[in-house]
Amino acid sequence: MENMDDFSPENVLAPPPPPPPMKKSTDLFMQRSNSFVSKATRDSWDRMFDEAHGADVLIHTDDNGLIYAHSNVIGMASDVIRGMMKQHKRKSHRKSISILGVPHHALRVFIRFLYSSCYEKQDMEDFAIHLLVLSHVYVVPHLKRVCESEFESSLLNKENVIDVFQLALLCDAPRLGLLCHRMILNNFEEVSTSEGWQAMKESHPRLQKELLRSVAYELNSLKQRNRKQKEIQTYTQLYEAMEAFVHICRDGCREIGPTKTETPHMSCGFQACNGLEQLLKHLAGCKLRSIPGGCSRCKRMWQLLELHSRICVDSEQCKVPLCSSLKERMKTQSRKDEKRWKLLVRNVLSTKRIGGSPFFLQAIDVTL
């Protein structure tokens, strides 16, 4: 580049300008090239940058490095850089600006992207964090989107997630920040032992406290969701048991009920039938059933029978044993027990808001 002074922007025939950035293509060629423009245009703009013919801007980098560029190209790509060039007051055919704080090669990758909107895969892996910062400082939105996409697809890991999270907050990259936050929550034990976490603990203790608070909140929310799911599962099983009760006592199933099936080994459509049949047989022959607290299986059966009597629509016509007598017994129960039972009944009935059984009440009919 010794004879670079012999060239000027006016004397150089520049290749056609690149098209505006497009959405990331799923075409294999575009994926392999890591580019948003056609190969011919990319090559021409890369060649213009590499050969630096007619370059009229000197970019000073760390370690006294220099990068030659064309003001009309980088000024069109970044309003911030165009403003920096306008502030240059020296009367020479070359403008001079300084971009410090990042490795020289990372800055070359950045300037090259301003030319052709492309990058090498290895360069992105090595300098993604620097490129994210540069894209924010010099307002290059399409490069910021590329960096976010690369972090999301492959570059984000447990070792760098803390650093990337802090940069995402500083660089106004909310989606990337959300992805980092999710990774921190899902891998907190490993992330909290990383070097990035220790550095953040010293430099940004408030942010560390916020993360710890969010982790505690997420764990508590997860426990509540799990408890709620288990409750719904229990209420659903109780509702299915109530349906199976009516089926057994009205139609009969396998070896119990008013009629017996010809194929007792075959399963019916009610999953709870087998367990209920075993409980009914046990209740019929258990010698401890009349002794208070004598048999846990009998106690469970009595509770199921009472639950049925509370949700049954017509106890007079019901075939389930003791339905009407248990309904009469409700009148003598304490207020506390009655309220507890009503809450259970409503929760059980709420599991079938649509298409409930015609033999049972609706949840809306139960008042606490």
Curated annotation (Swiss-Prot):
Pfam families: BTB, zf-TAZ
Matching PANTHER family: BTB/POZ AND TAZ DOMAIN-CONTAINING PROTEIN 3-RELATED (PTHR46287), BTB_POZ AND TAZ DOMAIN-CONTAINING PROTEIN 5 (PTHR46287:SF9)
UniProt region (CaM-binding), positions on chain: 335-358
Subcellular location: Cytoplasm
Protein name (database record): BTB/POZ and TAZ domain-containing protein 5
Listed InterPro entries: BT1/2/3/4/5, BTB/POZ_dom, SKP1/BTB/POZ_sf, TAZ_dom_sf, Znf_TAZ
Chief place of localization: cytoplasm
Gene: BT5
UniProt note on tissues of expression: Preferentially expressed in young leaves, roots and stems.
Assembly mode: Interacts with CUL3A.
